[in-house]
A protein has these predicted regions:
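TRAFAC-class small GTPase G-domain
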Residues: 1-213, 240
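Extreme C-terminal disordered tails of eukaryotic proteins encode short linear targeting/docking signals used
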Residues: 216-240
Length: 240
């Protein structure tokens, strides 16, 4: 009976862990964002901006919230290593795409990459947050301007694709994409100053709670816990 109660207590008090991937072009401020999150939520501060270099591979960080642990994976955004992103899609619970709202020359490239992320079937039902970073810059586009810029870019792409006889996106795929774009959440942040970072983390906390993905290792743990509890309960009943 002790083991049954102990197992039940551990199950009820354990903190669920969710994986969040941070992606975007190189130079968008992904690592600065992660380090600011670590500084705001952990006892040990993250790296200062002057110590941050280009990410080759990944950086990780973990924060503890009420009943929840968020594990962040900051993935390199250079052209030659973006193909690693898809390897993280199956196991992530949320996606953060960071766009440099101050770099207008690379917005088109950023939207092209973002569009490919939206098309990934593995994360079709995974919460996705678009962050317009570098809001501390006076030349930065606002949240509304970023949203409109992407919508305009996407509309131009659709019109161009319709003129291309090789274009073969099905109605269902197009409808799903249109629905996702319409419901897309865009938030403004300054990873450098920390402005908007806490609201973004709050968004993630709420969304991962409401959109849980059950993975094989989680399922196995639950089955083992249930089986163990059932055996303990059966022993107790037999002795009664």
């Amino acid at each position: 009976m002790y083991h049954l109660l102990k197992g039940l207590h551990e199950y009820l008090t354990r903190k669920e862990e969710f994986s969040v991937i941070i992606i975007g072009l190189d130079g968008a401020g992904k690592t600065t964002l992660l380090e600011k999150i670590k500084t705001l939520y952990n006892d040990t501060p993250g790296l200062s901006p002057d110590k941050i270099g280009p990410t080759v591979g990944q950086n990780t960080g973990k924060i503890t919230l009420p009943s929840t642990i968020l594990q962040f994976w900051d993935l390199g955004g250079q052209r030659g290593i973006r193909n690693i992103w898809s390897k993280y899609y199956d196991d992530c619970h949320a996606v953060v795409y960071v766009i440099d709202a101050d770099d207008r020359e690379r917005l088109g490239e950023g939207w092209e990459v973002f569009d490919s992320v939206l098309s990934a079937p593995q994360i079709l039902n995974v919460p996705l947050l678009l962050l317009a970073n570098k809001q501390d810059s006076p030349m930065s586009l606002s949240v509304e301007e970023i949203r409109h810029d992407y919508e305009d870019w996407h509309q131009r792409k659709l019109e161009s694709a319709r003129r291309d006889t090789r274009y073969a996106e099905g109605d269902n795929e197009m409808s799903a994409r249109r629905e996702r774009i319409a419901s897309l959440d865009v938030m403004g942040v300054s990873a450098l100053e920390g402005t908007g970072v806490r609201p973004a983390v709050d968004w993630l906390f709420i969304r991962v709670q409401n959109s849980r993905r059950l993975f094989p290792h989680t399922l196995c743990w639950m089955i083992r816990a249930h089986s163990s509890s059932s055996r303990e309960a059966q022993k107790y009943i037999s002795k009664s």
